[in-house]
Amino acid sequence: MVFAQTLVARRLEDVWSIVPEGAIGRHWWVLTQRVFSHWPVRGGTQWTPQRLTWVAAMMAWDEGQTLDARWEHAREVAGRLHPHWSLGTSYSGFAAALVRESPRVVAGIKAKFREVMLAMESRHQTRCGWRAFAVDGSRVEAPLTEANEEGLGCAGREKSGPQVFLTTLWHMGLGLPWDFHLGPGTDSERRHLEQMLDDLPQHSLIVADAGFVGYELCQRVLKARRSFLLRVGGNIRLLTDLGWEHEERDGLVHLWPLAHRDLPPLVLRLIILRRGNQEIYLLTNVFDPKQLSDEDASVLYEMRWGIEVFYRSYKQTLSRRRLLSRTPATCLAECSWTMLGLWLLSLLTVTGIVAKGLDPLSWSVALARNAVRRAMRVSLRGRGGRLLRDLEAAVKDRYVRRGPKAARDYPRKKREKPPGPPKIQSASPKEIQTAKRLREKISTAA
């Protein structure tokens, strides 16, 4: 029984300070303590960063319908796998410790997860020659308490309640999260992305739907020496024939809103994709078609759908559409650890899938969820599990469907109108003169 419990612990434990272990084979990882060792802990502390991490991650996987139920189950599993741990006996004490420790612990675990992802096989790191990252935001509902209304705010649709705004960077090659940022429901996904730019690898390509295009964000990405491929809609005005470039090339446009006429216009490349009767307009700062062809741009933009599926997995597959915490601080902590739990589950699963020579994008969230929940139940019965084998087999079905999987006309399904074309206009004589004076002013200052 001791061996069985240790086996389950090893398989649930592949996480916080993860290093490649070639001797084991199949490229699985073993745990070391280096992630937690640099965080000093006072003697007698029950909820250390390591124990908080274990319990919070397993709460993210648990199928309980209340926070108390998830916490009791996760605490029991952690106690079974680590009998020497002295764990607190109240959920309120755990929640207070989680809120207090989350900022430093979450940042440390994110960094470790990214190290592991960068160490994966190079052939899965890129798509169409780019280390591409999709970005998107989503709101998660929070309980309608007075504290949440005041601290989180109400945004989105009319009569909506308090929400947490979650913005995620998703690695399009590995199908894994790369980073995420949280804030009140009134936050901006553009501001969230700006705060995550510095943790992106050099020469990354950011792929996003309409809503991210703006002068300030594009300028910030350019200064960070990253590239982008952003859909643009009818709320954006683009200029041609401005004369800012010495050589006006086909496909070049200028993003130069009135509010930023004291700054240089952004020279960008416009890509127009045609799909049936629909046209999709994309802006990029990659001018060379050899580096990013129209065909590759089409493939990458279509792959951006993976982040939408990721949010569906978070909300529906894990049944985390609505947070359960009653204060803003605990809501943000709950959302953060649900994200880390899903990230960990995907990391464990994708590692096994890649070791078998399969595409990491083939992993099934539902099968991985079932496997880890079964392992948690098995650990309480004192029997060894088969978590690694189950996660390696957690891949999507490969058969070709003959009809839609979803109901024909789900009554509450959102059917948003796609963005219209941007307003593309030739620069007026006044705009050309303004640009000329600005260029002369910049040249004189230099």
Model-derived regions, located:
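A short, well-structured juxtamembrane/interface segment
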Residues: E115-S122
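Short, basic interhelical loop/turn and adjoining N-cap
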Residues: E76-A95
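Single, function-defining residue in the core of a domain
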Residues: M1-H73, S86, L98-E101, G108-K112, ...
